[in-house]
Amino acid sequence: KTAEAVAARYFASQPASQRGFVRAAPAPYRAFEKTVSKHTHQTHCIIGSRAFGISEDRRLPLALVTNILGGPCANSLLNIVVREKNGLSYNIEASYTPYGDTGIVAIYFSSDHSNAEQCIELIEGQLHKLRTVPLTARQLSMAKKQFIAQLAISSESNESYMLGAGKSLLVHDGIDTMEQVYAKVRALTARQLTEVAEEVFSDMSRLIYK
């Protein structure tokens, strides 16, 4: 009620705005591979695919899978395999961004030109593993705990939390508490993660600048 009172105080006199355009539906997705010569010092590569929109329930298991694959943690699969074990890339990460009517999942890395193909092979190996081999109970439990810890840390930023809450209110007409979010993460199963990985990671596009 306090928030409503503050909003009414500052915005009640403002006229409502109406969108003057109709958003076109995303075109059918077709995977591609493209290499562009940019004469860069390193090879820069993005491997990605269309993913779930913000209204789909499967966005949460995909977010967890993406975090396991290449999230902001030293023990992500790609960081261990590509960077730590083989020393092929200093910068490698995966991200998932949901939009109103679609989404995108992407893996980015940079490397010496001579290491790019090996990096791609290792990445494809991890994608295949996530699609075909379910996580063990221990692996899943550790991944959930880490993801929840990351969410808890990010919620300490008031600005970040309020932006997320505002988006949730606009899209879902409600705001989950952090405990509700944690409960949804804890309820995810290894099968759910394998299923979304199979659907999203099976037909990836590739763009290379070198």
Model-derived segments and spans:
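Short linear Ser/Thr-Pro motifs
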Residues: 75-76, 157
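An aromatic/glycine/proline-enriched structural segment found at the starts
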Residues: 1-55
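A generic structural signal for well-ordered coil/turn residues at beta-strand boundaries
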Residues: 29-30, 41-43, 47, 61-63, ...
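Active/ligand-binding-proximal structured segments within catalytic/core domains
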Residues: 47, 57-70, 77-82
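Charge-rich, well-structured scaffold segments of protease-associated domains
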Residues: 1-19, 52-53, 70, 84-210
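N-terminal short leaders/motifs
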Residues: 44-63, 158-163
